[in-house]
Amino acid sequence: MLSHSRVECAFKTLSVAKFGGSLLDVEGKGIPKIIGQIREIQKRDGTGPIAVFSAPMGCTDALIKIGESHAQECGLSLDPVFEIYDRLAKLYVKGELLKQAQEEIANYKALTQTTLDAVNKRFSGNIKARTLTLGGELCMSMLMDYILRSHGLESCAVSMENFPVVTDDNFEDAAPNYELSKKRLDAFVKPLKEGKLVCLAGFFGITPDGLETILGRGGSDLTAVFASCILKDSYQTKTLLYKDVPVQSADPKVVRGQKTDHVKALTYNEAHKASLMGMKIVMSPAIAWARRFNQPLMVVPIDEPEMFSVIEAQNSSGEIVKCLTGKSGCAILSMSDEKSRSFEDSLRIWERRNDFMDLGAETMETGEHIRDFLFLDSEFLKKNEERLKGFDENLKIEYGLGVVTLIGDKMKDSPGVASLAIGAISGINIKRGIFAPHTSQIILVVEEKNVAATVAAIHLKKQELNKPPAWPIGFQPLK
């Protein structure tokens, strides 16, 4: 039987709003916009919201550099990072709260420094997770609590001790545990019932025995989606992922002079493929949780919130090609087919990498069987090339490549898309073509220097690409 408290809030709408690093610039120009959006959400919902915050732009990379310097015994100072928090506090925290906020910032700096002092030759594991979050998301969410209270909003920050995102102990790429996290819902529900909004650190998790973890790059998306999922039994949750620009048919900086279209709706599959191939809409683990719990996601541009995009299981859009993405920094690795199985298993199972794809095997004129893999992150290969040669000392890597991808679930029922795309780039050398419209993507591998030109040329044909196929009279395609 449901408890009274469960029934009381069962139909209340609760928004979980994530504000990423691009909105938390080091000068604080995005903070008034964030405050404005939180006010709008409160006015609309009457409850919450839960506001998930990333670290300020550039802070995570700066903290990684500082941590690695301590591993080399030439430790860089934390001052440049914490000066950002001091500056934001002076700009946006008022009265007595300013002194309290500055004391909290100093405490986070001391905790971060103590953690760095424990670095011994390697900046990794729990020490890395603790450093990045103490100096990043935990400090930022605390500061945003003070900023919001200074602007007349009742808020609270979730402490490390009560943190409701419980994870495994894969410290640098942790996976949330649904059942264990559900047991800590009071960290959300209690302040929400008291009429407060909740400031939550993104990217951060904690093991059942209290050790700090991080959720991997883009982990703040996962924090917001996961929080929405574990609260679905108590609230009608909405997940709002605030960005600086709307989701568009292509990057306007790449297709200069062309009109881009606002992408109003994407399926989970389309969003996953677009993000993996360079669009960075929502990170893959967050999409996986949303799909599992059928949780719609709204990607909201903070300056034009009416230009939001909805990501859900299915949508009624008639577009064949939703968007085009371009990604540089790719490579093709070629190795013995016989040795490729253990190589692939090692990367997928032990390294937990899914940013590469099998291009298939071919038989050379020598009779040797070679298998090729497309890697979307050539830096990983450069850093680990010697180690990877342990699988095949004769493996070869072609660097300097990029990928251009056409995204759309409806391509599987629309012949001719690939030929139109290829016809648009007759002057560009296609290194490889992965024509798999049944997977909602057509991938063209080109030289890195040609990525932008390829995207621009194909985008010019987008209207033509989205015309339904003109079948001959009386002809029906096979289903």
Tell where the protein language model's regions lie, with residue ranges.
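Nucleotide/pyrophosphate-binding catalytic subdomain
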Residues: 2-282, 287, 445-447, 466, ...
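A generic structural signal for short, non-catalytic loop/turn and secondary-structure boundary residues
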Residues: 9-10, 192-193, 292, 326-328, ...
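Structural motif
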Residues: 13-15, 48-51, 154-156, 196-199, ...
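A broadly conserved detector of short glycine/acidic/proline-rich loop/turn motifs that flank catalytic sites
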Residues: 21, 161, 203-204, 245, ...
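A structural alpha-helix within SAM-dependent methyltransferase catalytic domains
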Residues: 35-39, 229, 291, 422, ...
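Glycine-centered loop/turn motif at secondary-structure junctions
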Residues: 45, 152, 195, 232-235, ...
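A conserved active-site cap/scaffold subdomain adjacent to cofactor or substrate pockets
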Residues: 268-344
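A conserved regulatory-domain signal marking ACT and ACT-like small-molecule sensing domains
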Residues: 309-479
